Structures are given as C-alpha cells and as structure tokens.
Amino acid sequence: MERESNAAVDVTAGADTPGESPERRRAEVGDVDRSMYDFVKPESGYERFADGLSGDVVEEISRKKDEPDWMLQMRLRALETYERMEMPKNWGPAIGGLDMSTISTYVASGAKQAESWDDVPDDIKDTFERLGIPEAERTSLAGVGAQYDSEIVYHNMKDEVAKSGVVYTTVEDAMHSGYEDMIREHFGTLIPMTDHKFAALHYAVWSGGSFVYVPAGVKLDFPLQSYFRLNAAGAGQFEHTLIIVEPGADLHFIEGCSAPKYNVANLHAGAVELFVGKGARLRYSTIENWSKNMYNLNTKRVRVEEDGKVEWVSGSFGSHVSYLYPSSLLVGPRASCEFTGITFAGATQNLDTGCKVTLAAPDTRASVDTKSLSKGGGISTFRSSVVVTKKADRARASVSCSSLMLDDISRSDTIPAMDVRNATASVGHEATIGRISDDTILYLMSRGCSEQEARTMVVNGFADPVSKELPLEYAVEMNNLIKLEMEGAIG
C-alpha cells in the first residue's frame, strides 16, 4: 500500500550518539574542493574514433581487442538491433539532446595496462591520485581496476587474494587467458541486447570494465574496486562488468564513476551482469558522480540462486539525465535481495531511477529502501517494480521510498508497480514525500548553526541509512557530494 504525504518531514536522524564509534560518525562534512572532480586533462596523442556509429567502427573496436569471431558477430548483431530499435517513448526524461552522430564511441590514451602506479603515465596517474584511488588501494582494498575513457589503464590485486583462486581482470584479458568459455556462457545472458536500444548500443561498442570470478567457499575480507573516469569531451563510455560468485563465496565489489563537466553531451551506457551462486553473498556498492552534461543510461542485473543474497548500495549524483534501475532475479528458494539507494537531483538534472525485483522461487525475500532529494528545480523520480511469480510461495517483499524536496520549484515522483501472482505472498509499498521542517532549521540555528549548515545537517541525517552501508572513505565521499550539491541551496 502506498502512502504519500506533503507534510513537513523532521529528518534529524544520523546525529552522533554517546558511545558511537568514530567509523559511524558521519554527519560532519569537510570542505569540498570542486576541482576534485571537474579538472580536465588534455587528450594530446590520444586515439579517438570519428564521431558516430557504423559497422566499420564496431569492427575496428573488435580488431583492436583481437576478439574471437563469436564476439565480433555479437557486436554486429547488436549494431543491427540498435539501428532497428526506436528511442524510448513515453518513458522517463526526454533524451532528445543526445545525438549519437556527435559521440565518439572509443577514446584511448594509448597507455598499456599497468600493475604498478609508477608505470601509469603521469597525467593519468595524477587524475586517479586526485580522486584518491591509490590511497584507497593501499589502505582498504583487495584489488583495484582503473579505467580512463575506453580502456583500463591500471589493474592489480593483492597476492594473497590471487592465491585463493580469485580472478580479477578485464573482460578482454580474461578472454585471452583461459576464461573465454566462461565468458561466452555468461556474457549478455542477463541483459540481452534486445532489452532496450542502449543495451544494443552497449553490446556493439563495449570496451573495458571488469571480470571477477570468486571460487566456491572463498570469502574476501576486503572489497575489490573498479573506478571509471570519462575524461574526453563528447565521448561515450561503455564498460562491461561481469561478476561470478560461486556457491558459498562472499564478495564486496565497489564501483566509482566520475567525469569533468563540458558544454557538450557525454554518454555512459555501461552494463553490469552479476551471478550469485547457492549460499553465496555479493554486495555491490556504487557511487556515481557524473558531470551534469552526462546522459547516464546504465543497465545492471543480478541472478541469485538458492540461499544466495545480493545487497545493492547505490548513490547517484550528477548527470543531466539518468535511467538507472538495477534488477534482481531471485530464482532459487530462499534467495534474497536488499537494495539501499539515494539520488540527489539538482538544477538541470532529471534523475529517473529505481529498481526491479522478480521473486521466482519459494520463500524468497526482497527489501528496498530508497531516499531521493531534489533542489533548484531538479526532478527525482523513483520507479519500483516487484514481480512475484506463481512458483514463489510465501515470498515477501517490502518497498519504502522517502523523498525530500528542498525548495518549491523541485519535483519528486514515486511510481510503484506490483505484479503478484501467488496468493501466499506478501508485498508492501510505502512512500513519503515532504519538505524540511522549518522548526527543525530554527532549532539547529538556535544551537549555533548557520542556515546553510542546518540544512546540510538535516540532509545528511536523511541520507544516513545509505551512508552507514558504505565503507568509511566512500561514506565521506558521499557526504562531501551532498555538501557540494547543497552549496547555494539558500536564496
């Protein structure tokens, strides 16, 4: 059942409490240097394909990667599918400003993939140092991949992780190092090229991304992370992430994204395919900080087997337009899904996000908890889709969406959809839409906060359930992004 309210919302949750550990004190946000994300590196000497899409472009990408014929044929079928399919109609924000004839589908620095930051070209290394990736690798990660425009420029994994049998590399490298059959078995099976027009585009020109294989019973103590940086103006990024977590294994994978702002359109149309085996667990965390000229048309999907569990943690910031609906297919008995997410739509932004869960086996469970914020005329739309099949006896699903508008010119919508075909299932939906309580702001100002500080504190409290699900350094980044979005929120 849906409940909508326009009443003022008091959302001061998240303030420090006595005895709370330092790792959980995240309400305070440090100053943000905008140059951390908006700096631009020159493309001198880079290889850049001509704008637009053609069979020659697709074949050249495949040739550069020395792909097997089956992958080339898949690309060519995808191109035909893309040309045949129409643009989305009557769905989400308008994307008429995206003209593929002005987008380059492949840009590469020419740098060889390195296993040491010392071997990465200085200009590219400086980019990732400013984003904090090498430091995060040293302190809290089991492995890191870094993509710059269309190609991975750095990839490394700790020796002890590799010795456990974990494979963490690019899809391209995996195809040439004994995993071609595994990739062919899984690649493009969860997200077919016919899913939508931009899925077809992705399969035609995909480049880069990550391949992760975790053997049965292996549990990683630290996360793996891939970071995707789109530096080139008027370009697209089309990475493909393929993760296979075998029965009884455990993995936390983190995905980070950013790009500088240009006065021309950029496009991100990646794909994420995740396979969670019997009794396995996968947490997939994402902080997306695309620039506000970006069209973010990403597709993510997971298949979860018996007693398996997937946990999505998603923070969506930036981009001009976003279509993002991670989908979970619970196909084994007692498979479960948890989705925790937040979006922040500021001026000129229209973020259409949400998630879909299909419960297709007995005793499956799904929990969705999302937060959305909008200010400065930004539009935030949350779509949820819960499907319960006839076989899903005693399935349980709950969806909760809380929206907070920070002014009178912004907009927030909640669009739930439920398809329940089993009488023993229980499905619930709750939505709240509101504004910051004036009384809350006045109280915080009476305690010494400025109005700007008070509003930022309230918003951080609102976002705290998502922040708590992230590793400390990524929670700090998310809170910094919130403060960056909050600058100028008064007046």
What spans do the regions from the language model cover?
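Conserved beta-strand/loop scaffold segments within soluble protein domains that form the structured core
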Residues: 154, 160-449, 463-491
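Short, low-to-moderate order helix/coil transition modules at the start of elongated helical scaffolds
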Residues: 2-271, 275-281
